[in-house]
Amino acid sequence: SSTVAVKRKNMKHYSVGSIIWIIVEYASLIFFGFCAIIPIVSCITTAFKTDAEYQNTNVMAFPGSWLNFDNFVNAFKTANMGRAFLNSVIVMVVVLTVSVIVGSQLAYVLNRFKFPGNGFIRNLYTIAALLPAVAMQVTVYQIMSDLHLVNSLGGYIIMSCGTDVISMYIFIQFMENIPLSLDESAIIDGANYWQIYWKIMLPLLKPAIVTSCILKGVGVYNEYYAANLYLMRKEIRTMALSLYTFVGPMGSKYNLICAGVIISLLPALIVFVCCQKQIYSGITAGAVKG
């Protein structure tokens, strides 16, 4: 056909080195694609296997029955995943609300008001972002312990609401595309800065809010290290920490762990399917049009 002829004609313009490089690129993509898919397939197949099937078959072998939901039921009950999910939702709602309000207000001040020390404050937040969180946990844990906030869901929420530099810079980036004429027009109409923030800035920052909530929400939902450090009581564990129930000194029940992993992924998958349009628009939007 004419299409095939055109493709063959275009291929003549490629050198041997270019063709080899294209082959290497596609081969690399296929290889890394398999590397990403294999653990997911292994997790799904293992979640449906009985204990005997898991011990006597390899991880990629299909289970005897895809209708074996015993692992899911046992994982949900044993790890008290219903309560863990509720705890995760509480943490996420509070942390994301605080992150959006504080981050957007801080970005509004740093972007709209030019005052002595503006650049210094930005540099301080940049330095805070460069400090590894693990290295600061000793000091943070001592402070939380002195305040009797360890082993408390409220204390963990307060700790998780700490400096969110990424969200602040996301809001600053979006605000730079919002014309100052909107602020000036609102001031002429009698609005103060507080009203400008709530009635003009915040509604226009919806794409940035979506982006910030995605980045922060995924991190909070999947957080294991800090949750394991501050949430020791079973009734206040989060979803990520509840999976540790099946790990013991006598071994790990990987079929139950895989079932728990799938259960913990379902809420995030449902949110993604229902809100994928807003998610994509929030990530790709680089400007706000007035």
Regions found by a protein language model. Name each.
Residues 1-16:
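Short, Lys/Arg-rich, polar N-terminal cytosolic tail immediately upstream
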Residues 13-17, 21-290:
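A structural signal for multi-pass alpha-helical bundles of membrane permease subunits
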